[in-house]
């Protein structure tokens, strides 16, 4: 067999280029209808990859929304996507068409990391029987272990005391509060999943926090986007292992905790935690190949709850303290309400929330302004849908831009400013506009929302009950900007926590 040389090689190259362009043209042609959402013209093969800033997607989408409207299209590689913006369009997609937009697309990097049929957890699982079974189990089990009940409130209250002790130990010193906040929230989640609490100085806890941070960084930005666009790259020997070291380490940590729990589990005793309850379900369905209760799915469900339940709440608390040192007038007013309703001795309780409209408004405004999850995880349409008179075909990937709702200029008086009055009426009563969607909406809304609301209220009020927070002397005023991607955390900052005196 002769090797191709000269003119032959040129012929093959030209044929390959023409073939790629024809395939690209066919991909585009199926979307060239008068009712398909408009968008920037994609490049061959790369699509719009070079036309958006993957390190600051919310701003890129904001500019595109201003140009093309609330519903516009993008193409990332071969994949066509439709971005949904604004309250009206978001309600149509997540609520009106909720049944047809609840599915998830396949994501190659997650498949490489072990997300596959039978072990997809809750967050990434396709919309169907397995997802329903696991979501129903997670919601009911968390409820049985105290979600919204007094038992869980006691756990959070006790952890709030440990958190205050940690701040007391460093009172008056410039500190970055993030590690302490992460520790507190992690312990609440660990209590629910493993019935276990870690001391804040525990090397295992410190290691877990670092690995979790690394794992989230690995699945965001340019490299994972390119791997998803061209999954053949995942077959390059050694590349995936190097790119996803944090993910592998996190999986090993979770597996170790599950092994410890499994070794002490007594099936004849009532379950101590969510893991025990899942193990009991595995025993019940032994021999049923269609059940989603298995060891692999246990690992994924725990990963879902542990990662999503921890980083979102701790990051929101970090935003809360930053905004308090930037707005001391708001901080003083919250403390006045705490003193009037709770006092400075009794521990805050969830029952206090209804009598604290200003504090409640501040917590909600922190969530709106912090906007820690600007982009929902992608959805995929299971049938043709109509949104704002546009026709979105079956199999289209949807990107819900939640930031566009939390900053919707038609809803919020001062969308780009921290303004707790967004959640107060003229009489000072708490109100919640329908555009407040930090936990998403519809069938895929965050199952841990009740837990997050409890943690935010109890941790925040306990901290402001005991401390006043300020910018350290001699340091510049921190910026109130976030660092994309998920979760959008504040730029690193320091604060001083000073213990409040009685009556102050």
From Swiss-Prot:
Heme binds at residue 446. Signal peptide: none annotated. Coiled coil: none annotated. Gene3D superfamilies: Cytochrome P450 (1.10.630.10). GO terms for molecular function: heme binding; iron ion binding; oxidoreductase activity, acting on paired donors, with incorporation or reduction of molecular oxygen, reduced flavin or flavoprotein as one donor, and incorporation of one atom of oxygen. The keyword Phosphoprotein applies. Keywords: Endoplasmic reticulum, Heme, Iron, Membrane, Metal-binding, Microsome, Monooxygenase, Oxidoreductase, Phosphoprotein. Transmembrane segments: none annotated. It is found in: Endoplasmic reticulum membrane; Microsome membrane. GO terms for cellular component: endoplasmic reticulum membrane. Induction: P450 can be induced to high levels in liver and other tissues by various foreign compounds, including drugs, pesticides, and carcinogens. InterPro entries: Cyt_P450, Cyt_P450_CS, Cyt_P450_E_grp-I, Cyt_P450_E_grp-I_CYP2D-like, Cyt_P450_sf, Cytochrome_P450_fam2. Belongs to the cytochrome P450 family. Cytochromes P450 are a group of heme-thiolate monooxygenases. In liver microsomes, this enzyme is involved in an NADPH-dependent electron transport pathway. It oxidizes a variety of structurally unrelated compounds, including steroids, fatty acids, and xenobiotics. PANTHER family: CYTOCHROME P450 508A4-RELATED (PTHR24300), CYTOCHROME P450-RELATED (PTHR24300:SF119). This is Cytochrome P450 2D10. The lineage of its organism: Eukaryota, Metazoa, Chordata, Craniata, Vertebrata.
